[in-house]
């Protein structure tokens, strides 16, 4: 399955409709990227979604070589200028550039596996299972993006959120977003009716039990554009097994751009 191309959904039979209510006798294009983005809380919060094909390897003639090509996500802080008295050296400032490299060859594998029985195919809506699984897989990639990035952030044991800490990271208030996990820590409905955590605009996520606040626009998730889909017949009863393999990873240039509630 190629995530960089539109996917065709067949017309629905009479009386059975899918999520986007396709009229009988028509087809519609499903944009994989749009579905993934719509179902990823970290992307909605500002994180980049990288879906791009590997760059073709250059020609090295007849020489045997090992070739590895990495991509880069870079976050750039403002340069720290300081007042310098006459005759003194300029002070050494911290490096304002934060890089995170990744490559498709080293991206981890993720898999989804499901069993489809003959009864599932014969039930009402069974002839739409292919389209339903296609949508489920794309939505699952959105939640996979959430899980990978939030795991990477929490693995760095972020500090407790304060507005002062956000200011120290050159943040604007409008850049900050919060994702409230299953424990609901710090969640509240403000006086204007908006959902917030520690005063920051928030959204719910099932990818963690923690509440993460940060500058998601300074991070990304990379998903390899091809999915490997395997369908296997299990027995003479008509049961089949569906396995989908993906490659995705979080790309986090600077974990200090995130905090917990």
Regions found by a protein language model. Give the residues of each.
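Alpha-helix capping and helix-coil boundary motifs
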Residues: 1-4, 12-13, 124-131, 162-168, ...
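Short, intrinsically disordered N-terminal pre-domain segments
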Residues: 1-16, 86, 260-261
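Short, surface-exposed recognition loops or helix-turn segments adjacent to catalytic cores
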Residues: 7, 11-31, 146-165
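Sequence/fold signature of self-assembling virion shell proteins
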Residues: 14-43, 190-261
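Assembly/oligomerization interface modules of large self-assembling protein complexes
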Residues: 18-108
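Short N-terminal helix-initiation segments at or just after the protein's N-terminus
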Residues: 54-57, 126, 130-131, 186-188
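Long, contiguous amphipathic alpha-helices that act as assembly "spine/axial" helices in icosahedral shell
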Residues: 94-161, 233, 238-246
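Internal, well-folded beta-alpha domain core
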Residues: 143-187, 191
């Amino acid at each position: 399955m190629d995530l960089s191309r539109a996917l065709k959904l067949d017309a629905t039979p009479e009386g059975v409709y899918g999520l986007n209510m396709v009229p009988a006798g028509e087809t519609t294009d499903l944009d994989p990227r749009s579905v993934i983005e719509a179902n990823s809380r970290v992307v909605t919060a500002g994180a980049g979604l990288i879906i791009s094909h590997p760059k073709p390897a250059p020609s090295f003639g007849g020489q045997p070589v090992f070739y590895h090509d990495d991509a880069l996500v870079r976050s750039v802080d403002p340069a720290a200028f300081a007042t310098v008295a006459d005759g003194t050296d300029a002070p050494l400032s911290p490096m304002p550039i934060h890089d995170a490299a990744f490559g498709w060859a080293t991206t981890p594998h993720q898999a989804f596996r499901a069993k489809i029985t003959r009864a599932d195919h014969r039930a009402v809506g069974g002839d739409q299972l292919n389209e339903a699984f296609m949508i489920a897989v794309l939505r699952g990639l959105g939640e996979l993006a959430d899980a990978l990035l939030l795991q990477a952030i929490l693995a760095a044991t972020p500090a407790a959120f304060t507005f002062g800490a956000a200011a120290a990271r050159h943040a604007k208030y409008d850049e900050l977003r919060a994702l409230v996990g299953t424990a609901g820590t710090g969640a509240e409905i403000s006086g204007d009716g908006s959902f917030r955590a520690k005063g920051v605009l928030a959204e719910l996520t099932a990818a963690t039990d923690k509440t993460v606040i940060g500058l998601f626009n300074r991070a990304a998730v990379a998903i390899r554009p091809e999915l490997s889909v395997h369908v296997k017949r299990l027995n003479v009863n008509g049961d089949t097994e569906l396995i989908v393999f993906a490659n995705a990873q979080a790309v986090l240039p600077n974990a200090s751009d995130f905090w917990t509630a």
